[in-house]
C-alpha cells in the first residue's frame, strides 16, 4: 500500500504540473503593419519599409510555452516575408518565413498570419524580413521570458532593456542589391545614430539607470552585413545567454555579435554617478582588406542624479580588425550545464559533413563590365556549389507535394577537391574549377532524429572573412573553433563535449573552422546560409530536408490554407543580376 500511495502521489503531481503548464501558456496576438514610411536618421529623409511605423519595429514579448499569432499586413510596395530568427518552429515549418524556401512572399496589398508555439526556448531572439535587403529596416526583438512562476537562472534584474543595432544607408533600400557589400553611412542603436554623425548630435539612445541596480540588456545585432563590437565605458557586463540559450555567467568588458546574433547581459550600475558612453564598432574580419576609418556609434548611460553638464566617459574600443578579441569572446561562451532547457551533447554521430565555404567567381556576361577579381562577378559557395533560389514555387511546397524539377537532393558531404583551404593558389585546372563554383539548387536529405556533425571550413579562394552561418529550425552545439585547416585527428581531440554553447548563428573564423553538431528532430526544409545579406545573392547557402519520423506527431503537417501563392518574384536573390557596375 505505501508503494501504491507513493505512485498515485507522483501521478497526481505530474497531472497538476501538466495543468499548471497549460494554464501558464497563453495565445499572444500581434499585428505588423508593413508600410513605407519617411525617416531621417542622418541628414536626408528616406522612404523605408517599416513595421508599425517604427525603426526598429516593435518588440514582441512572449513566455515559453505560449502560442504566438502575428498577422502581417503588407501595405508596402515590396514583397515581404517575416522570419522568426532562432525559433525552433517544431512541426510549424510553414511559419518559418524563409522566402521561396518555406513560403512564397506576401505581395503588396495582401496579408498572412503566422502562428506557432514557443517551446523549449527562453531569452532574446529577433524577427526580420527575409526578402532581399528588407531586413535592413524590417526587424525587431523577440523576447521570450520563462513561464509564469519560473525564475531566471540568475538574480532578477531591476529592469530589462532591448538594445537593437542597425546598419543604415542614406539611399533607397532597393539600390542595396545593385552593388556588392556597399559601405553603410552609419550604424544605429535603437534607431538613433548618436553624436558621432552629422544631423544626429541630439538624437542618441539614452539608458537612465539607478546606482546600485542591475539591468538585463537584451542585445540584438540586426545589422545587415556587419559583426559589431559593443562596449560600455568603465563598466563590465555579465553575459548570461547567447542566441536565447543560457550560458555560464561570463564577465567581460567587450562583446561581439555577428549579424543575427543576440546576447543577454547583466549590467550593474556600480560606478560613480555620471554619464557613460556605450558604443558599437564594426569588426572588419576580411584578411588583406584595408581597414576604413570608422566612427563608433554611441548611446549614453545616464545615472540618476547626473548633472546635465557632466562629460560622458568614453570606452576604449578594439581596433576594427581585432581578431584576437573577437575570438576570445566567442570561444569563452559555454552553456549553463543543468540550466533550463539544457541538454547534453549527443556522443553518437550518424552523419558527418565537411563543408568548405567562401567567395569565388562567376563568369561576367559578354559586353558587361563586372567589378569582381579578374573582371568577373563575385559568387559564393558551400562545397563548391552556388545555391540558386527557386522562382516558381517554394522548396517546402515542392517537397511536400513531390513536385520535381525544383531542387536536387545531391548536396555532397565533402568538397569535390581537397586543397590547402587557407592558402589557395591558382595553379591547375582543378584550382580554376574551385574558383568558379557550380550553380545549382542542391540540398541535403537527413533522416529524422539523426545526429549531424558539420565541420565548416573557411577558404581563401577570395579574401577570407568571418561568415556568420545561420541554421533555420534548430540550435546546434558549437564544439570548437580554430584557425588554419581543420585536422580531423589533432583538432577533434580538442572539441568541447561537456558544456559547448548552443547557437543558431555562428561566425566561422577567417582562415579557420568551426565544428557544429545538432539533432535533426524537426521535419521540413530548413535553410542554412550566411547571415550577411550581401552574400545571399552570391549563393553561400544550402538547405537541409529533414525527413518525416515514424508517427503523425513526427511528420510534416499540411500547409495552411491561406499560404501565400507564388508569382514570379523579381526580388528573388539571383547573383546574375548583381555585381554589375551600374554608374548613376
From Swiss-Prot:
Q: Does the keyword 4Fe-4S apply?
A: no
Q: Which InterPro entries match?
A: Cu-oxidase-like_N (IPR011707), Cu-oxidase_2nd (IPR001117), Cu-oxidase_C (IPR011706), Cu-oxidase_fam (IPR045087), Cupredoxin (IPR008972), CuRO_1_LCC (IPR034288), CuRO_2_LCC (IPR034285), CuRO_3_LCC (IPR034289)
Cofactor(s) required, per the database record: Cu cation
Query: What Enzyme Commission number(s) appear in the record?
Result: 1.10.3.2
The family database entries (Gene3D superfamilies) matched by this protein are listed as: Cupredoxins - blue copper proteins
Task: Please tell me which top-level EC class this enzyme sits in.
Answer: oxidoreductase
**Protein family:** Belongs to the multicopper oxidase family.
Q: What is this protein called?
A: Laccase-8
Gene name for this UniProt entry: LAC8
